[in-house]
A protein has these predicted regions:
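A generic beta-sheet turn/junction motif
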Residues: 44-48, 57, 321, 442-444, ...
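Surface-exposed beta-strand-turn/loop segments characteristic
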Residues: 1-41, 52-72, 127, 133-151
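Conserved small-residue
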Residues: 1-15, 107, 270-273, 498-622, ...
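C-terminal beta-barrel architecture of Gram-negative outer-membrane proteins
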Residues: 646-721
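Extracellular/periplasmic, surface-exposed regions of secreted and cell-surface proteins
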Residues: 80-99, 145-202, 214-548, 705-707, ...
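Short Pro/Gly-enriched beta-strand edge/turn motifs at strand-loop
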Residues: 17-25, 299, 612-616
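Transmembrane beta-barrel wall of Gram-negative outer-membrane proteins
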Residues: 28-105, 169
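Glycine-rich, aromatic-lined ligand/substrate-binding cores of catalytic
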Residues: 577, 581-582, 623-658
Length: 811
């Protein structure tokens, strides 16, 4: 009952003064939300006609505590019919329909509210005592801080509406003609339409400045604006191919297939914006009113369209001798309009061979133990034409001068501009893969084992070309100038069996799998010096370079001695980030190369030449790609009860949190990033009374440009985990019961998703899911220090635990 907000005279005016302890996440998000899933299917037919029809509806209510919660709805339907027209012809049609609708209250994308709540101090309430929203007043950091950027007001108003609607329709019609037993001719055509429409509406955000004085946020999130977006995708695909299959002398089996494929893709988008909508509840461009200052309506319309075509010939030949020796050769010859003439066509052959060792006479003594043993090897190539449309040509665009007019009137002058230079020699990126595998089945099929190793070479990857002269004023065009080699393996082991339990069969199974891979750059044309600011030959993809830290300074004297003899200042840290120099509780960096940087002063903690061969005092601390990925499936059924579970995990996955990841750094990022500070955070922070802690001396902005910003060995995290991905328990009623009510099968079940996980990251924060703790390799700083940084790694929609109860009924 304490007065969390009081009125007081400050600066000669009556003001609100805040002494709150608000849990902003609890106030803005709910812990539980309902989920619905419904599905139905019908199948049947006769000797010559068979049909299948299914449909489903899903509805998920989100976690937002707005006037209207965020809601996702999905409808799907599938209809298939197969008809035998006569002795040699059959016709089938397969149609699918999918529609989804996601609506939410907010500004822009759904992650917006997470971004803004990160920096909301608990000392502020959501609203003032008079009911007005809290946004800004002179007492809040001198009037220079906006509480939650007004997102709690947005939730309460319910007028910032957004939706994203998707519609997906696909239909495939196929005709098969079989004039003789050994040969058939197949022709099919697929049409797919995808529509995606979206809307975003923002309105002015009113708030209270002080008692009786009000303001409004009218820019950015508070701009009175309506935006509507529409996207349309059309796909046309046709295939015609013939297949010949025959056997000779009960030993030789041959299958030959050859065909032609053609695809066309068209895309169009339109985005319209308008400001000054006359009604906050109605969203229509007809309600735009002129801007009072100019007398003109503020609108913007933009869009574009593109298309590409793909054509190709394909074929495959299979041969086996008594099911013992197996050979397959296949290939594609594809052409894409995304490349210039002379570079459009690519040939992509593949070949594989298998040897069923268990069919050899010499293997007969072991066949009771090993029922099937197969050795296989393959080589294959695959083309990739996923580049932007028209990338090989320069395009011309027309735009208006924003501030210049010619002649009388207000019509803006127009100009034409040409795009940056492109390489006309762009062509297919090609992947070559070599596989070696072993399949085994033992103990009458109860135990099975599969192992496979592979090497994948990706050739002619697109990268930025050699830099053009600076006077040219444009970036270099992209070229096919990089190669990548990936090596990996996959292993799977399974066991299934049954035994009698209380006179009833108890069937059970267990399966475990593990896989791993590494990727290295084998060619990269534009970085011969191996600068750490870019990719380089020999680099393992995902490597994290960082400094080595061997602890925290115990005393100020120890810190000053280090500053006098090892490093007087960290040149890559902003001067305002370490005021007072090194002090007790700061990180003690290790001088790995014993080299001095520059003239004057003492600085042995350096970046060296910033290359892989001369990285200064940095080394590779770990790798940001997950390794040793594994999964375990367990299941059994007995007397109508069934149980299954799936555990999934990663053996190693190194990650260095970005500066604004408050779930890990808390107030080390920004002083006012306290909305999600862990309750026991102060116990983990260094102080003279508590020196043996994990986190260092509190310094504002430490993780956003300070000593914690560059990756280091102390705070790099191994976010390996084991997750209980799914657990399902069901019970099927005895058939004698269901038959009595004219039903074939009735099953009740419970299912849980993401029920629990185990990870070492829990030792330092329980608010961070290991699968959301990752760094996208999207941008590198000029000095290469933040080569894996991504400020958005803490604002994804939270991982959710799902618990479902359901019933399956079969008629």
């Amino acid at each position: 009952d304490r007065p969390w907000v009081i009125k007081d005279i400050r600066g000669g005016k009556e003001q609100w003064v805040y002494y709150c302890n608000t849990d902003w996440y609890h106030e803005m998000f709910r812990d539980e939300h309902p989920v619905q899933q419904h599905s139905i299917s019908v199948s049947g037919g006769s000797k010559n006609i068979k049909y299948f029809l299914s449909g489903g509806y899903d509805r998920q209510t989100g976690i937002m505590k707005a006037t209207e919660p965020d809601v996702f709805q999905k409808y799907n339907m599938r209809a298939k019919i197969d008809a035998k027209l006569n002795k040699i012809m059959s016709l089938s049609n397969n149609m699918s329909f999918y529609s989804s609708d996601y609506s939410w209250i907010g500004v822009g994308d759904i992650q917006d509210v997470f971004r803004n709540l990160r920096h909301t101090p608990a000392s502020f309430p959501l609203f003032n005592p008079d009911g007005t929203g809290l946004y800004n007043n002179p007492l809040i950091i001198g009037g220079n801080y906006n509480v939650a950027n007004g997102r709690q007001i947005v939730f309460a108003m319910g007028k910032h509406k957004n939706y994203d609607k998707k519609f997906n329709f696909a239909n495939t019609t196929e005709l098969v003609i079989r004039p003789v037993k050994q040969f058939n001719l197949t022709a099919n055509f697929t049409y797919r339409r995808v529509n995606r429409n979206g809307m975003g509406r923002t309105v002015n955000i009113p708030y209270g400045i002080r008692p009786g004085v009000f303001g409004a946020y009218t820019t950015g999130a508070g701009l009175n604006e309506l935006e509507e977006r529409t996207r349309r995708y059309d796909y046309y695909t046709g295939n015609i191919f013939g297949t010949y299959e025959d056997s000779f002398n009960n030993a030789h089996n041959v299958k030959v297939m050859f065909g032609f494929n053609a695809e066309t893709y068209r895309y169009k988008n339109v985005t319209a914006k308008g400001q000054n909508i006359s009604d906050e509840l109605l969203n229509d461009f007809d309600l735009i009113v002129p801007d009072p200052s100019t007398g003109a309506k503020i609108t913007n319309l933009e869009g574009g369209q593109s298309e590409y075509a793909l054509a190709g010939f394909f074929g495959r030949v299979n041969y086996d001798y008594k099911g013992k020796y197996l050979v397959e050769a296949s290939g594609r010859y594809d052409g894409s309009s995304r490349f210039a003439k002379g570079h459009r066509w690519g040939l992509f052959p593949s070949v594989s061979a298998g040897w069923r060792i268990s069919e050899e006479p010499f293997f007969a003594p072991a066949k009771k133990l090993v029922n099937n043993l197969k050795l296989r090897a393959s080589f294959g190539s695959l083309g990739n034409q996923n580049v932007k449309d028209y990338m090989f040509m320069r395009t011309i665009s027309i735009d208006d001068f924003k501030a210049f007019t010619f002649g009388e009137g207000s019509t803006k002058a127009q100009y034409a501009g040409i795009s940056a230079p492109n390489s006309s020699s762009l062509t297919w990126e090609t992947t070559y893969q070599y596989n070696l595998g072993l399949d085994a089945s033992m103990l009458n099929g109860r135990l099975d084992f599969t192992a496979e190793a592979y090497i994948r070479d990706t050739k002619n990857m697109l990268i930025q070309g050699n830099a053009l002269p600076s006077v040219y004023g444009e970036d270099a065009p992209k070229e096919n100038s990089a190669d990548l080699r990936t090596k990996g393996y996959e292993i799977s082991l399974g066991w299934r069996d049954s035994f009698e339990l209380l006179g009833k069969p108890f069937n059970y199974s267990i399966r475990a799998s593990v896989s791993d891979y590494t990727s290295h750059i084998t060619r990269y044309a534009n970085n011969p010096d191996k600068r750490l600011t870019d990719y380089y030959v020999g680099q393992r993809i995902g490597d994290i370079w960082g400094f080595v830290v061997d602890g925290l300074f115990a005393t100020d004297e120890e810190a000053k001695d280090y500053q006098a003899n090892v490093c007087d200042a960290l040149t890559y840290v902003g001067t305002n980030r370490m005021q007072g120099g090194f002090l007790a509780g700061d990180l003690r960096y290790v001088d790995l190369d014993n080299k001095q940087e520059g003239e004057g002063g003492i600085n042995k903690i350096t970046l060296g030449d910033n290359t892989a061969d001369s990285p200064g005092d940095r080394k590779i601390l770990g790798n940001s790609l997950p390794s040793l990925q594994y999964g375990i499936n367990l299941g059994f059924d007995w007397m109508g009860f069934d149980f299954s579970t799936f555990l999934q995990g990663v053996g190693n996955h190194y990650w260095y949190p970005s500066g604004m990841n408050i779930a890990f750094w808390g107030s080390y990022s920004y002083a006012y990033y306290t909305a999600f500070m862990p309750r026991d955070f102060i116990k983990t922070v260094w102080s003279e009374e508590n020196p043996d802690t994990y986190f260092p001396r509190p310094r504002v902005y430490s993780s956003t440009g300070g000593e914690l910003a560059p990756p280091n060995s102390r705070y790099i995290q191994n976010v390996r985990y084991l997750r209980l991905k799914n657990l399902t328990v069901g019970y099927t009623l005895p058939q004698k019961w269901t038959k009595a009510i004219c039903l074939d099968k009735v099953r009740f079940y419970f299912s849980g998703e993401n029920l629990a996980y185990w990870s070492p990251i829990k030792k330092y924060t329980k608010y961070l899911d290991p699968e959301s703790a990752y760094r996208r390799v999207t941008k590198k700083s000029n000095d290469g220090l933040y080569q894996n940084s991504d400020a958005k790694d803490a604002v994804a929609y939270p991982w959710q635990k799902t618990i479902m109860f359901g019933i399956d009924i079969t008629f």
